[in-house]
Amino acid sequence: MNYIGSKRTLLPFIDQCITSIAGEVARSGTFCDLFAGTGAVGRFYKLQGCSVTANDWQFYGFVLNQHYIGTCDPLPFLGLKDHIPMLTTTALPERGAVVCRFLEDLPPVEGFVSRHFCPGGTTNDAVQRIYFSDANGRRCDAIRRQIDAWLRARMITKGEFYFLLTTLLENMDSVANTASVYGAFLKKLKPSALRPLTMTPVECILSKRPQRVFQNDANQLIGRLQTDILYLDPPYNSRQYAANYHVLETIARNDSPALHGKTGMRNYADRRSAYCSRRHVRKAFADLIERANARYVFLSYNNEGLLTFDDIQQVMERRGRYGRFEQAYSRFQADRPSAERKIKATQTTEYIHYLVTK
């Protein structure tokens, strides 16, 4: 998934920083990713052998992490063997792909996504929304409806539900008619948005170690956690993730919310992050660090964030030994620079601030 702030390409730098301070703990200890997003960092440390705790406040993020972090064993899909006979002769590791192909072949139906996020469903509205093609919207509606029906009928487990929903979210994002975020859609369907939606199965990361996933406000959760390594990747600026990914949130929740404005925004008042507010961010960060129960704390932040270097250093060094690493990084651009919209710089500096607690 093309996600603002994703640390996928920065993983070598992040791991180098963490292992240089925490050593073998980063291969065998407990690791908490408190602002997990799509789970890229948590996935990496799960693969390294850590017991990972992942948390994200958005439901779509919770779903992704429930699968990538929370799922540790193969998914057998025993409850669907009568519904999909091919499962009876399919090896365990391949059963997820069989179920995904079944969903991919469902007849399209009209539903919430096709009626509210596609051009055909919004033709008579004040604004025609073009987040997805009509065909992909209807395919999404059919698949999402079937996944919920199986869960209600107890034909799939929660783990199987998260696998299928994660697969749908990842594949829908790959055919979205956006410039990476859902705060706006493009005026015409781009080539990738015209591709038919597929259900290419997402990877399953197996593990024998316990893994945990939460959906909480980070500052409310921190007092309940104890970990060797606490990794923090909060929002850097005023853009709320609840607004930037509202369409994925609606697909994940499948709750048919009231929508507002040109972009079809759902109400996200209860998901506003203090880390996106210049007025509240320092207080929230100080509270988080003060109550963190961890041997090592690592903070990813860049030079364009709302917190200043002084803010970060003053807060972190109260709890122990502070330091930081840095690396140049290509900044996120949702669209190309133009005469009307000029990008300040093509690169930012990414920092890893660290704290070894007393």
What is each of the regions a protein language model found here?
Residues 51, 58, 62-205, 238, ...:
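Class I S-adenosyl-L-methionine-dependent methyltransferase module
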Residues 215-220:
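Conserved SAM/SAH-binding loop
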Residues 274-323, 327:
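Conserved Class I SAM-dependent methyltransferase catalytic core
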Residues 308-358:
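C-terminal catalytic and target-recognition region of SAM-dependent MTase-like enzymes
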